[in-house]
Design a protein with these regions (language model features):
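N-terminal secretory signal peptides that target proteins for export/translocation
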Residues: 1-6
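Bacterial N-terminal signal peptides
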Residues: 9-22
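Conserved RNA-binding domains used in RNP assembly and mRNA/RNA metabolism
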Residues: 23-119
Length: 119
């Protein structure tokens, strides 16, 4: 491959990469709303302890130090927040559907707000 062709491929790749990084809503670190079931990071989508309701399991795991999580389809996001109002809402919505607005980085959502999903 000639040097000119290598340069052309490199420039095209750089332009495409830069363009994709600035597409609104696609950039890493952008705020979005996730809808899913409130759980905990220890159990995720599976609460298998016999004799305990899933909502009670979520609360027990969080009380033992686990973080809240949001199950969205097959994906489990760990929820990160120190806001007491958000934590209280997550506790109230244990094992229920919720809308969580925040910034996702990998498998963690930095929570900005939590609301119930109207039934």
């Amino acid at each position: 491959m000639s040097r000119l062709r290598i340069l052309q491929v490199w420039v095209a790749t750089a332009v495409l990469s830069t363009g994709l990084a600035v597409v609104p809503g696609m950039a890493a670190g952008s705020t979005r709303t996730f809808t899913g079931k409130v759980s905990d990071a220890m159990c995720g989508a599976k609460h298998t302890e016999a004799g305990i309701a899933p909502a009670d399991c979520v609360r027990a795991c969080v009380q033992k130090g686990a973080k809240y999580a949001l199950v969205v389809g097959d994906k489990v996001y760990t929820l990160s927040t120190s806001d007491q109002a958000a934590l209280d809402t997550l506790n109230k919505l244990a094992w229920e559907q919720a809308k969580v607005t925040g910034t996702a980085t990998g498998d963690t959502i930095a929570v900005k707000s939590v609301t119930s999903v109207a039934k």
